[in-house]
Design a protein with these regions (language model features):
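Aromatic-lined ligand-binding clefts that engage carbohydrates, nucleic acids, or primary amines
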Residues: 112-143, 177, 241-269, 275, ...
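Carbohydrate-binding surface patches
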Residues: 1-4, 261
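An acidic-aromatic loop/edge-strand motif
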Residues: 4-101, 130-133, 151-240, 250, ...
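Short, surface-exposed beta-strand/beta-hairpin micro-motifs centered on an aromatic residue
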Residues: 279-282
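Short, surface-exposed loop/turn segments at beta-strand-coil junctions that are enriched for proline
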Residues: 116-118, 167-169, 287
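Solvent-exposed serine/threonine-rich low-complexity stretches and specific carbohydrate-binding patches
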Residues: 145-154, 270-277
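Regulatory/sensor and coupling segments of signal-transduction and defense proteins
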Residues: 92-105, 109-116
Length: 330
C-alpha cells in the first residue's frame, strides 16, 4: 500500500503539551506529548491477513452447522450433525460397548467472504500451515479447485507456512471457500485457522468478512487498527508536527487505549530508539528537529495474538477480547 499525499494530514491529529522533565543525567528537558488520536498515514510492513477461525461443517453437504476449527472428534462434541450411519458401536463381548464415528467419513467445511466492488486486491493468497488440514483433502474456491501446484512455501510466522495465489479464483462480491476432507481418525479435520493473505483491508458486514482497499489513513489509538484487525507485525504511522526549535527534548506518546507493544519513534527519518516496555519515552537529540513542521514516524510491532487467536489483551478490563465479536457489535 502506498503512502498518502505529503502533508495531507497537517498537524490536526496532534496535540503538543510541554512540561518539565528530568532526563537520566539530571538535566531538565522539555517533554513533548504527542497524542495518537486522529488520523495518521499508515504503512504496514508486511501483507495483511483475514483470519478464519470458524467455519460451517457438514457430513452430507446439505445440513450445515457453525464450528470452531479443531479436530474432527472435538467438532463432533460441539455439533449434533453425526448420527445414523456415521456412528458405530464397538466393544468385546461382556464389556461395555462404546460409540465411535464410523470412519472413513467425508466431511465438508465452508466459509464465505466478500470483496468490495472495484477493490479486488492486487495480491491475494490462501495461507495456512502444512498441518492445518489432516486427512486427504481438496480445496475449492467458488467451485474451482485450488491445484496442488499453486502451493508454495512461505515464511509468515512459521517455517510450515504455505500459500497459494488465488487471485484468479475470486471475484468481486460474494466468494466461498469449500474444503472436503476424508476423516479416517479422530485427529483429522480442519484443525487450525487459515487465512487470506495479501494487499487488502478487512472489514465486517452482516457477520461476514469483507476485503476492501487498504486504508491509507487510520487512527493508531485503538485496541486494533481499523482495516487490519488480524494484522501481526510492524505497522508504520506517520504525520507532521510543528516544533518550536531544534533543542533536545523528550518525546512521549499519549494514548486513550494503553499500548504495551514494541515501539520505535523516528523524527525526520532518524530513529530516537525503541521502547519495548514502560516508561515509553524517547530522547530526541538536539538537531534532530528543526523549527517548523517535522515528520514524525511511529513504528509499532505487536504480537501474534491478533493473527493466531483473533484476540487482543484488554488492559483496561484485564481480559482477552475477541476481535471479530467486538467488530460485529460495533
Amino acid at each position: 500500500m502506498g503512502r498518502g499525499p505529503e502533508g495531507a494530514l497537517g498537524n490536526s491529529c496532534l496535540s503538543l503539551v510541554q512540561a518539565s522533565m528530568m532526563d537520566e543525567g539530571g538535566r531538565s528537558r522539555c517533554a513533548k506529548h504527542i497524542s495518537m488520536a486522529g488520523k495518521w498515514k499508515c504503512l504496514p510492513q508486511s501483507l495483511n491477513v483475514c483470519r478464519f477461525g470458524e467455519t460451517e461443517v457438514s457430513v452430507d453437504g446439505t445440513n450445515w452447522e457453525k464450528v470452531e476449527v479443531k479436530t474432527f472428534i472435538e467438532q463432533c462434541a460441539q455439533t449434533k450433525r453425526l448420527g445414523g450411519e456415521q456412528i458405530a458401536m464397538e466393544g468385546e463381548f461382556g464389556t461395555p460397548r462404546k460409540l465411535r464415528p464410523a470412519y472413513p467419513i467425508t466431511c465438508f467445511y465452508k466459509v464465505g467472504f466478500k470483496i468490495r466492488k472495484g477493490e479486488l486486491p492486487s495480491e491475494l493468497f490462501l495461507l495456512m500451515d502444512k498441518e492445518t488440514i489432516s486427512g486427504s483433502n481438496a480445496i475449492e474456491i467458488n467451485g474451482r479447485v485450488v491445484e496442488a501446484s499453486l502451493w508454495k512455501p512461505v515464511r509468515v510466522n512459521d517455517f510450515n507456512n504455505q500459500a497459494a495465489d488465488i487471485r484468479s479464483l475470486v471475484r468481486e462480491g460474494e466468494n466461498e471457500i469449500c474444503i472436503r476432507v476424508c476423516i479416517r481418525k479422530d485427529e483429522d479435520g480442519l484443525r487450525d485457522p487459515f487465512y487470506l493473505w495479501g494487499s487488502f483491508g478487512v472489514g465486517f458486514e452482516d457477520g461476514c468478512h469483507v476485503l476492501t482497499a487498504q486504508p491509507e489513513q487510520v487512527c493508531p489509538d485503538a485496541p486494533w487498527i481499523q482495516g487490519f484487525p488480524y494484522y501481526s507485525g510492524t505497522m508504520e504511522f506517520e504525520t507532521e508536527i510543528e516544533f518550536d526549535s531544534s533543542e533536545a527534548c523528550i518525546l512521549a506518546l499519549d494514548w486513550a487505549y494503553p499500548s504495551h507493544e514494541s515501539i520505535e519513534v523516528l523524527v525526520n527519518g532518524r530513529s530516537t530508539g525503541i521502547c519495548a516496555y514502560s516508561p515509553y519515552l524517547w530522547e530526541c537529540e538536539q538537531g534532530m528537529t528543526e523549527k517548523g513542521m517535522n515528520r514524525v514516524t511511529v513504528r509499532i510491532s505487536n504480537t501474534l495474538a491478533n493473527m493466531l487467536d483473533g484476540t487482543y489483551f484488554d488492559y483496561k478490563e484485564h481480559r482477552l477480547a475477541d476481535i471479530r465479536q467486538e467488530a460485529e457489535e460495533r
